[in-house]
Amino acid sequence: MPELPEVETVRRGLQPAMEGFRIDRAVAHRENLRFPLQKDFAARLTGQTVTGLGRRAKYLLADLSSGDVLLMHLGMSGSFRVIGADGETTPGEFHYPRSEDRTHDHVVFEMASGARVVFNDPRRFGFMKVFPRSEIETEPHLKGLGPEPLGNAFDASLLAKACAGKQTSLKAALLDQRVVAGLGNIYVCEALFRAHLSPKRKASTLANRKEEPTDHAVRLTEAIREVLGEAIKAGGSSLRDHRQTSGELGYFQHAFKVYDREGKPCPTCGGTVQRFVQNGRSTFWCPKCQK
DNA sequence: AATAGCCCCTGACCGC
DNA sequence: TGCGGTCAGGGGCTAT
């Protein structure tokens, strides 16, 4: 599924079922997702209480009473279902409907809350890993991640520094998780549109010679925070709508201004939204508005 | 070191 | 209906 807003929505949806509850039983229905699951994966989870459920970039991090951390990534198609006494929910449903195919239910947590938390992932680009909390700084998946775009540390000056001297495109730079963590293809397109910046522009143009932020960097920083904030809000509200009508699309897609809107009118200038391929991935933009 | 491209995998959709 | 090609929210690895 996910970029930052979807992962955050999933986190909030899982919290009531997991946080503060013991994992009575963990079951892995196959020995690998994207990577092989550790041999002791289920054993290290069973009997542990989830003391907190956090997020870093597009990763979910469940703190366990044992001192381990359960790291979870949804890849492209991963989703969770929470099956409780009062029915079934899917936190973080988004642009594409989640898989209904039970053959892709790969991992199940039976919580002491009575809820079953099921991880489903048809493409298996997602993965899970358990490691000691003490290794959080050296964990390869987390090491080198850039700042959280909604965190206090992230500002135009940080973004400018990270992009200074970069010869690659602004689009590619923003997708690089070392520059800023949590953006994906959708929100990069949307943020660039809101900032009126071309995806083809060199990343280095966010900084001047002293590596100080240009106006572009200021605009882009604001656009990133704004679009992520709005998307998280929409994720929250689409959750409620969604309990009734399973199988429909999410909510924030209606707020897309350029993503997935090739050939449709630009909401700002009335021109036409264009699509082209950049580093192997679709970029959607309005050439008239974005310079 | 920085950058671009390939690849992992399944399913949906489109044109023939 | 069936078949092949294309595309999809990510990111690790490898070759320049």
UniProtKB/Swiss-Prot annotation:
A biological process (GO) of this protein is: base-excision repair
Q: Which domain of life is it from?
A: Bacteria
Recorded hits in Pfam families, A to Z, give: Fapy_DNA_glyco, H2TH, zf-FPG_IleRS
Q: Where is the active site?
A: 2-3, 58, 281
Question: What SUPFAM superfamilies does this protein map onto?
Answer: Glucocorticoid receptor-like (DNA-binding domain) (SSF57716), N-terminal domain of MutM-like DNA repair proteins (SSF81624), S13-like H2TH domain (SSF46946)
The protein's required cofactors? Zn(2+)
- Between which residues do disulfide bridges form? none
Is the keyword Protein biosynthesis assigned to this protein? Answer: no
Q: Which residues bind DNA?
A: 104, 123, 166
Q: Which residues cross the membrane?
A: none
Q: Spell out the PROSITE patterns in the cross-references.
A: FPG_CAT, ZF_FPG_1, ZF_FPG_2
The EC designation for this entry is 3.2.2.23, 4.2.99.18
Which segments of the protein form a coiled coil according to its record?
none
Catalysed reaction equations from the record: Hydrolysis of DNA containing ring-opened 7-methylguanine residues, releasing 2,6-diamino-4-hydroxy-5-(N-methyl)formamidopyrimidine; 2'-deoxyribonucleotide-(2'-deoxyribose 5'-phosphate)-2'-deoxyribonucleotide-DNA = a 3'-end 2'-deoxyribonucleotide-(2,3-dehydro-2,3-deoxyribose 5'-phosphate)-DNA + a 5'-end 5'-phospho-2'-deoxyribonucleoside-DNA + H(+)
Q: Which UniProt keywords apply?
A: DNA damage, DNA repair, DNA-binding, Glycosidase, Hydrolase, Lyase, Metal-binding, Multifunctional enzyme, Zinc, Zinc-finger
Q: What's noted on cofactor binding?
A: Binds 1 zinc ion per subunit.
Which GO molecular function, any one, fits this protein according to its record?
Answer: zinc ion binding
Similarity comment text for this entry: Belongs to the FPG family.
Write down the PANTHER family for this protein, in alphabetical order.
FORMAMIDOPYRIMIDINE-DNA GLYCOSYLASE
Q: What does this protein do?
A: Involved in base excision repair of DNA damaged by oxidation or by mutagenic agents. Acts as a DNA glycosylase that recognizes and removes damaged bases. Has a preference for oxidized purines, such as 7,8-dihydro-8-oxoguanine (8-oxoG). Has AP (apurinic/apyrimidinic) lyase activity and introduces nicks in the DNA strand. Cleaves the DNA backbone by beta-delta elimination to generate a single-strand break at the site of the removed base with both 3'- and 5'-phosphates.
Assembly notes: Monomer.
Q: What is this protein called?
A: Formamidopyrimidine-DNA glycosylase
Q: What is the species listed in this Swiss-Prot or TrEMBL entry?
A: Rhodopseudomonas palustris (strain TIE-1)
